[in-house]
């Protein structure tokens, strides 16, 4: 995915960066007359939940997901579908490819969300320039996601003396 995203951005003449953690940033400049609008950051993650049935022989690193249509649903044979945040990635790619009036857009694709948010945790503070971020990873259709599904626990101790 990292190589695909890098090629996607570069082939369209968009500023594209891959950081040392493997996160990808593709920036789309504002359209004419919209340069003074605030930069909006859109974020999705590019990894998937790799689960399979015991009798399914698949190598998630090399083998394609076998899909089929069941009514109105796309499903996978013996594995998870691998579309956890695929819709978020697809929305970003459509915006990067689209011809519409817009302010500056930064599309951030983070890695390793499923295994501890290591992509987001490894991101440097200057990787993006925008001040507004919209996370495109949500569990339910038609709902806006306000915070992060991942997290960190902090335990602090304080000695109090009178």
Can you describe what each PLM-predicted range is?
Residues 29-32, 97, 159-162:
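Short loop segments at secondary-structure junctions
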